[in-house]
A protein has these predicted regions:
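Short, extreme N-terminal segment that most often corresponds to the first beta-strand
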Residues: 2-30
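Charged, low-complexity surface segments at secondary-structure and domain boundaries
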Residues: 19-24, 39-44, 74-80
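Charged, amphipathic alpha-helical linkers/stalks
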Residues: 32-50
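Low-complexity intrinsically disordered segments
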Residues: 48-132
């Protein structure tokens, strides 16, 4: 007997459904640690601090310039290759498919971090794991 479970993306398996997981190649001039620090700071500096009424009046385009806290925590986790568990499937994938694995980061973030996600997509060689 075989059980088949339909999923939307690989991130559905490893995180809750409001998460986005990106595999990012560091194609910047920053070191891996500098890039990690930058992503955390970028996320903090783009948090929306206004009130709900202001948020409701904003267009979706304006909202995409901010990161919001998700109802369940609104987390951001950035891991270098060396910080990944050896059994983690993405680390295994990096080992099998990519040269120079230490140039990769795994970014796990809540979908409501629109500004951070947009920066990752626009500035890093990033793959959303739902596309793997």
């Amino acid at each position: 007997m075989k059980l088949i479970i339909a999923i939307q993306s690989a991130s559905d398996i490893i995180t809750n459904s409001s998460s986005e997981v990106f595999l990012c190649q560091n194609n910047t001039t920053m070191s891996i640690q500098e890039l990690k620090d930058f992503l955390y700071e970028y996320n903090r500096s783009n948090q929306f601090t206004g009130d709900w009424e202001t948020w409701q009046k904003m267009s979706q385009e304006e909202r995409n310039n901010y990161d919001m806290g998700g109802g369940m925590g609104g987390f951001l986790e950035v891991c270098s290759y060396d910080e990944l568990d050896d059994d983690y499937w993405l680390k295994k994938l990096i080992n099998e498919c990519y040269d120079n694995p230490k140039q990769y980061l795994v970014v796990d973030t809540d979908w409501c971090h629109k500004a951070t996600i947009n920066w990752i997509i626009e500035n890093l060689n990033a793959v959303n794991t739902e596309d793997l």
